[in-house]
Amino acid sequence: MRILYFDATAGIAGDMTVAVLLDLGVPLTHLNNELGRLGLPHEAFVLSDEQVQRGGMTGRHFVVHLPHQHGHHRHDHHDHRSYADIRQMIAASSLAGRVKDLSQQIFMQLAEAEAKAHQVAVDQVQFHEVGAVDSIVDIVGTAIGLDWLKVDRVYCSAVPLGGGFVQTAHGRLPVPAPATAELLKGLAVHADCGAGERVTPTGAAILAALAEPVTNMPHMIISQVGHGAGSRDFADVPNILRGFLGELPEQADHETILELSCNLDDVTPEQLGYTMEQLFAAGALDVWHTPIQMKKQRPGQMLSLLCRPEQKDRMVQLVMKETGTLGVRLQQMQRLVQQRRIEVCQTSLGTVRFKISQQGSKPEYEDCCRIARERGLALRKVQQIVRREYCHER
C-alpha cells in the first residue's frame, strides 16, 4: 500500500500541498494538461514553480499566475462561484474518475464548513478566496497529484492553530477563521507557533477530506520526501510542508487503534478483575493493569485497554460505570498487524485451531486449555503434542 504522510507542523495551504506533490515527481506539464480538462479558458491561468528558501530550508514554491494578477498576492481579484457551480464544473469535466471524487470531497468539506460558519444553505455558499481560479487549481491539482502518484492513503501530523487576525471577504476575522476552525474538527492541532494564518481554509479542507490524523508518523518504508514552500516567511519556523511518500511493510496490515487509560486507587482486586472481563467481553483488543504510585504516596493501579476507534464510547462508558473513575485518557496510535490466518488441525488429542503467520504457527490457547481440562493433562504437554503433530503433517 502506498501512503503519503504530511508533516504539517508548520502549517498547510493549497499551494503548498501541490508544491509537495510536484517535488515528489508529479510533472508540471501533466498537472497543466489535466487542469485543462476543467473547461476553464486557456488564458485563465499560467502555472510555474521554483525552488525557494524558507527559514534555512529549501522547498518548491507553486504559483498560479492570473491575467489580472498584480504583484505577488494570490487573491487581488476573485471569481466568485457558488458551491453548486464548482460541483457542476468538476462533474462535467473530462477528469479521471478518482480525480473527480477527491476534488468533490474537498469542496464538499469546504462548502459544509462555510455554510455552518455563516449560517447559509450549502448550495447557497459563495466561495470568495476558495472560489478564485488559483484555489480551484490548488484543490483539483492536489487530486491530480495524488492520483498520479497512486497514493492509497494519506496521513497528517498535528497542525498549528496560528493566531492574530486575517482579512477576508467576510471582514477581519480571528485566526483560525470560523470556516477553518470548523474544518479542523477531528484533526490534531497544536499551539506551538507564532501569530499568523498557518492553516488556510483550502489546506484544512484537504486534510479534513482526505487525511487521517495521527499522533506519530506511521511505520513506513520512505521512498521520497517532498518539500512545499508557502508564500510567506515566518520568524519562528520555516514555512515548509513536508510530504513523506512510501509503502507500508508488506508483511503487516496498518490500522488505527486507541489506547484508553485511567488511574485507580479505590477499587478492589475483585472489581478490577470483573471490569477487565467486561471490557474483553465488549470487544476490547487487550486490557491490562499496571501498579503505580499516585499522589499522597498512595499505591494504585493504572487500567489500560486497546480498542478500535468505533468502540471508544462503549469502552469509556464501561470503564466509568465499573470503576467510578471521573476521567479516561485517550491516545490515538498506529499499529502494524502481521497478516495471519486460522487453520483447523485434527490431532490425536482432538481438534485444534492454529494461528498461521510468516513468523510460524501457534496453537490457539483456548483450544489447548479445553483439551488439558478434558484429558487431565498439563497445558504445556498439550501444547508440545499438538505442535509436534502439526509440524509433522506439514
Swiss-Prot record:
Record's Gene3D superfamilies? mk0293 like domain (3.10.20.300), Transcriptional regulatory protein pf0864 domain like (3.30.70.1380)
Query: Which classification does the entry list for the species?
Result: Bacteria, Pseudomonadati, Thermodesulfobacteriota, Desulfuromonadia, Geobacterales
- One MF term from GO for this chain? lyase activity
Q: Which of UniProt's keywords are assigned here? A: Nickel
**What protein name does the entry list?**
Putative nickel insertion protein
Record-stated family: Belongs to the LarC family.
